[in-house]
């Protein structure tokens, strides 16, 4: 116990503090859970209060929402700065070697502790998901769980309804397009940060990181106020189109790609690039034959993370969607708000199965790539 408090805890304090602040920032940004559970019970937080102020279209709704957004944004930025400062403060106490060996030996109590942990995980994770899936097959929520109350009509409706189908199409388009744009922008910034560090590139990286640090509801309001008017020269606006959502997703999730691409570039020995230059390879040849293959696992990991975040995004989309640009999160929320809970559960089940399949596919591809790289190495 003394070793834990004197050695282990101080050395892991950076990770613990980072985790706490990350959870705090995530809770500030959480809109979906609070909107589903809080709004019907008249429990409001800043994010849902901003949302309700905007959709009310009252005399000064945007002014009130902007004022609350500034308050929420300040809290989010301060939390992000504190997280960065904590990581910097305890950086010297970290070790380079990862040690996964156990610190405590529970002996006969091990089975009891593991059983309690699995019970908690089952209650807070698996039970809600099982309830969601079962409800997706029910004719009505009040009809019980008997076979006479089970049907596939909810799924038939989801796949035949124009709004549901359009939401699936829009979310897939936004997810793929956002991932492709972010991988290009994020990898370029990551490469410059590692290989060509400068004050300018640090400022650029900081600016790109801000939209991910602040709650998405603030970003949505900022984009509405910025893009609501027609663009100069072309006299066109992207407001109330799917491209407005694309802009918000790229702005919000590029930071995720930068982190993963930075890891890939850091793991690549600069001597490989120097060897390509000595052999007379052009910039394009160096990137296509050396850099991209070496950082590919990290960049593809970032792309997958960006795609999944874009596929399930609701916070920013709740403000920016319009007729024809609905996303999966928006349609599920609208179904629930309108009382069509079984339809919402059916569409949610489809989304969960899709995400599970994509995660398994990603892990399979990653395992194959690691095997090939290990064999070639």
Predicted features and spans:
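C-terminal transmembrane helix and the adjacent membrane-cytosol boundary/short C-terminal tail
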Residues: 2-6, 19, 62-105, 192-193, ...
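Transmembrane alpha-helix signature in integral membrane proteins
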Residues: 9, 68, 72-86, 162-195, ...
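N-terminal signal-anchor/first transmembrane alpha helix
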Residues: 73-81, 101-131, 202-208
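Membrane-interfacial helix termini and adjacent extracytoplasmic/periplasmic loops
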Residues: 34-42, 98-103, 138-152, 200, ...
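Cytoplasmic-entry segments and transmembrane alpha-helices of multi-pass inner-membrane transporters
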Residues: 2-3, 14, 107-117, 188-223, ...
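Loop-to-helix entry region at the N-terminal start of transmembrane alpha-helices
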Residues: 119, 163-175, 213, 222-256, ...
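Transmembrane alpha-helices
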Residues: 2-29, 115-129, 210, 214, ...
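Interhelical loop and adjacent transmembrane-helix boundary motif
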Residues: 39-75, 106-110, 140-143, 150-163, ...
């Amino acid at each position: 116990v003394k070793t834990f408090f004197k050695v282990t805890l101080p050395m892991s304090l950076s990770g613990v503090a980072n985790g706490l602040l990350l959870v705090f920032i995530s809770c500030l940004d959480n809109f979906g859970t609070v909107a589903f559970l809080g709004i019907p019970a008249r429990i409001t937080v800043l994010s849902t209060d901003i949302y309700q102020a905007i959709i009310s279209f009252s005399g000064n709704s945007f002014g009130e929402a902007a004022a609350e957004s500034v308050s929420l944004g300040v809290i989010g930025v301060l939390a992000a700065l504190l997280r960065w400062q904590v990581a910097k403060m305890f950086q010297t106490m970290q070790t380079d070697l990862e040690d996964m060996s156990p610190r405590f030996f529970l002996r006969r109590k091990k089975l009891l502790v593991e059983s309690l942990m699995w019970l908690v995980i089952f209650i807070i994770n698996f039970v809600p998901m099982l309830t969601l899936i079962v409800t997706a097959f029910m004719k009505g929520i009040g009809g019980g769980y008997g076979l006479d109350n089970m049907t596939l009509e909810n799924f038939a409706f989801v796949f035949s309804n124009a709004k549901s189908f359009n939401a699936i199409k829009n979310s897939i388009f936004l997810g793929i397009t956002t991932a492709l744009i972010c991988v290009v922008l994020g990898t370029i910034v990551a490469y410059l940060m590692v290989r060509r560090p400068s004050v300018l590139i640090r400022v650029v990286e900081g600016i790109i990181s801000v939209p991910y640090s602040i709650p998405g509801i603030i970003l949505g309001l900022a984009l509405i106020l910025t893009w609501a008017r027609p663009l100069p020269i072309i006299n066109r606006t992207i407001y109330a189109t799917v491209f407005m959502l694309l802009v918000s997703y790229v702005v919000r999730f590029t930071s995720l790609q930068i982190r993963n691409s930075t890891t890939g570039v850091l793991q690549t020995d600069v001597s490989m690039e120097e060897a390509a230059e000595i052999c007379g390879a052009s910039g394009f040849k160096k990137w296509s034959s050396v850099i991209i293959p070496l950082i590919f696992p990290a960049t593809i990991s970032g792309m997958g993370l960006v795609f999944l975040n874009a596929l399930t995004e609701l916070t920013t989309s709740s403000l920016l969607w319009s007729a024809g640009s609905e996303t999966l999160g928006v349609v599920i929320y609208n179904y629930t708000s309108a009382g069509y809970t079984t339809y919402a559960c059916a569409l949610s089940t489809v989304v969960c199965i899709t995400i599970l399949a994509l995660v398994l596919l990603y892990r399979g591809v990653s395992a194959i790539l690691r095997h090939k790289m290990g064999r070639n190495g």
